[in-house]
Regions:
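Conserved helicase ATPase core of P-loop NTP-dependent helicases/translocases
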Residues: 96-102, 265-266, 276-308
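Conserved pre-motif I regulatory segment
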Residues: 1-36
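A short beta-strand element within the Helicase C-terminal
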Residues: 304-307, 313-328, 334, 341, ...
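Conserved Walker A/P-loop ATP-binding site and its immediately adjacent core
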Residues: 46, 63-84
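Conserved segment of the helicase C-terminal RecA-like domain
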Residues: 342-371
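Walker A/P-loop
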Residues: 29-50
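Post-DEXD/H (motif II) to motif III coupling segment of the RecA-like Helicase ATP-binding lobe
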Residues: 138-198
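Conserved interdomain linker/interface between the two RecA-like ATPase lobes of SF2 helicase motors
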Residues: 178-255
Length: 474
């Protein structure tokens, strides 16, 4: 039955359409579906199309279907709202500081707000038929459990780039089935993600030795912020950050991931002294100020943003040219979310530069490594599960005696190349002119479908979709 709801959406990329069909088919078999697709490949656009199909089916059959979309940050809620508007899906928002409009069948809610003790009656009264959870790797938290208790048999979809938990306990206690998309490497080969050059400190560096000796962890199992600050927020290490930026990414647009507000401010100050156009953002930055910085960053008026976990999830700026990792982590989720911010392809970006100043790849391998998502989904009850822990850092103490001056400098670890036949840039087959792009923008603003635009330019539909993506019009 549910598989019949899925419709062909010409604005989706081929793999998104395939994923949408698979999601509806999975709902024929079970209630709770988790879907994995890498950062930067369009999960929000995908589930917005799912919602549009459900709503259309309900209208056609005279059934008022209610849908609740859940996210854990206001930036994600606003991004979801923007995508729903593109599909002309009227909706309300349930989040702190937002005026509620509960007459709409579709509601986008903050998990913190909808499960707050003052709103739990509201959550139950919504009487929803479908629940969509963004960044669903968070869904094992107690706040999400309240939704499962309220709606045990409601159809649910959880989307995430990383179905992974620090304790490796899996997700089978809340989800019935995991659907997995193509790998990062396949998306790069097909041109839907950008290739990269990966620079890192060596495995016998003094920084890794110090990181390996940290023995203070937070409740989730990651390094304690205070311990990280003690090890990483030192002038010599910040100098290494600046030097590696100047050597490999100077003048490029990028994001730096830092440990804390204090660490972020220290990095920002030293980069500014070197003449870099840079700002820092964290959770305490006023929302209007944060939006202004992000807009200026997108417009090219700011070159670098240093942030503390603000841009790990949901941030969309395709023309980011480099990512710098200045914060060690034991979380595969953080690692892939952070490097993934730089892998969106654009017409003017041949590849992304990744500056790994903390040796994260020694813990998690390269961004394009094969991941055992099904094993992580099943968790510890699966005896063949390969834990995402590395012996590299455990062996650092054995390598201390090999430390030499200069080992903290970055070297090229991996350089992904893509054959020209596989590149995402359609300019290989069609030379796009400025006036072509202006016409594309006009047709897009008029909400012409890719098939109509393809007829105008006498190009195949897939080439048009790729060009629209390159221009950030889709």
């Amino acid at each position: 039955m549910y598989s019949e709801i899925s419709k062909i959406d010409r604005s989706l990329r081929p793999y998104q359409q395939e994923a949408k069909n698979n999601i509806f088919s999975a709902w024929d078999e079970c209630d709770n579906v988790m879907f994995q697709m890498p950062t930067g490949t369009g999960k929000t656009r995908l589930f917005s199309s799912v919602i549009s199909d459900i709503k259309t089916w309900g209208v056609q059959h005279g059934i008022p279907i209610k849908i609740l979309i859940i996210a854990h940050r206001i930036e994600l809620i606003e991004q979801i709202s923007e995508n729903l508007e593109k599909y002309k899906v009227s909706h309300g928002i349930i989040a702190g500081g937002k005026q509620r409009d509960l007459k709409h069948l579709v509601q986008v809610a903050s998990i913190q707000t909808i499960t707050h003790r003052n709103n739990i009656d509201l959550a139950g009264a919504l009487n929803v038929n479908f629940i969509i959870i963004d960044e669903a790797h968070h869904s094992t938290a107690n706040s999400y459990k309240k939704l499962w208790d309220l709606y045990p048999s409601t159809k649910k979809l959880g989307v995430t780039a990383t179905p992974w938990r620090m304790n490796h306990m899996g997700f089978t206690n809340i989800f019935d089935k995991l659907l997995v998309s193509k790998s990062i490497q396949e998306f790069i080969a097909d041109g839907w993600l950008a290739p990269y050059s990966y620079y890192s400190i060596n495995d016998n560096s003094s920084i890794l030795r110090d990181i390996n000796n940290i023995d203070e962890f937070d409740i989730e199992g990651d390094y304690k912020i205070s311990a990280l600050e003690h090890v990483m927020d030192r002038s010599c290490i910040r100098a290494n950050l600046l030097n590696s930026y100047k050597k490999y990414a100077e003048g490029k647009k990028g994001i730096i991931y830092s440990i804390s507000r204090k660490h972020s401010e220290h990095i920002c100050s030293e980069y500014k002294e070197a003449g870099v156009n840079i700002v820092c953002i964290d959770s305490k930055t006023p929302r209007d100020e944060r939006r202004l910085y992000v807009q200026r960053f997108r417009n090219g008026q700011i070159d670098i943003i240093v942030n503390v976990d603000i841009f790990s999830e949901g941030f969309d700026c395709p023309d980011i040219e480099f990512i710098q990792l200045a914060r060690p982590t034991r979380s595969l989720v953080k690692y892939l979310q952070q490097v993934g911010r730089g892998l969106r392809p654009t017409a003017n970006k041949s590849k992304c530069i990744i500056l790994d100043n903390v040796g994260a790849h020694l813990e998690f391998d390269m961004p394009n490594a094969d991941r055992q998502w099904f094993e992580e989904f099943e968790g510890d009850k699966n005896p063949i599960r390969k834990k995402q822990t590395s012996s590299h850092r455990k062996s650092q103490t054995k390598k201390e005696q090999t430390f030499e001056e200069g080992d903290d400098e970055l070297t090229l670890i991996d350089d992904i190349q893509v054959e020209s036949s596989s590149t995402n840039s359609v300019s290989k087959s069609y030379e796009w002119k400025v006036e072509d792009d202006e016409l594309l923008k006009t047709l897009s603003e008029k909400q012409c479908s890719p098939s109509v635009i393809a007829a105008v330019f006498k190009q195949d539909e897939e080439s048009i979709v790729k060009r629209l993506i390159e221009l950030n019009l889709l």
